[in-house]
């Protein structure tokens, strides 16, 4: 998985199990730019796999839990360009309902531990969602829809999540 320095380690790290890999990758496992797969592994994926509407790449990625070796490459190679006034869909729902539902399913199947799932959700709650709010309401560089945000948090996050997200901005 390629993270372009977003994790801050600026190195490559290998993992011998999916749980440790996901724990260290955290919510970046949702990033479509980072996912890559060998064609031979892609061809083994069940053709009837139901792809998540917002995270089809993550649906594919999570099928690779049985692999023997995983790699996170956090070396910086590219300058990421900010797209002004980026938006158009409900990114808040994507990270309060859709992506957490994939993690929940992965946990229920035993591919990641409850500790791993909670770690990833905590990262979203104190890092990712506050940055979305900051970009939308404070510096106004993104225009993502946030309809249902406060209510959607109640499904996969603790009862205090809304307030923690707000104070983390």
Regions found by a protein language model. Give the residues of each.
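C-terminal subregions of glycosyltransferases and related glycan-biosynthesis enzymes
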Residues: 59-62, 66, 71-169
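Conserved nucleotide-sugar donor-binding catalytic segment
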Residues: 2, 6-94
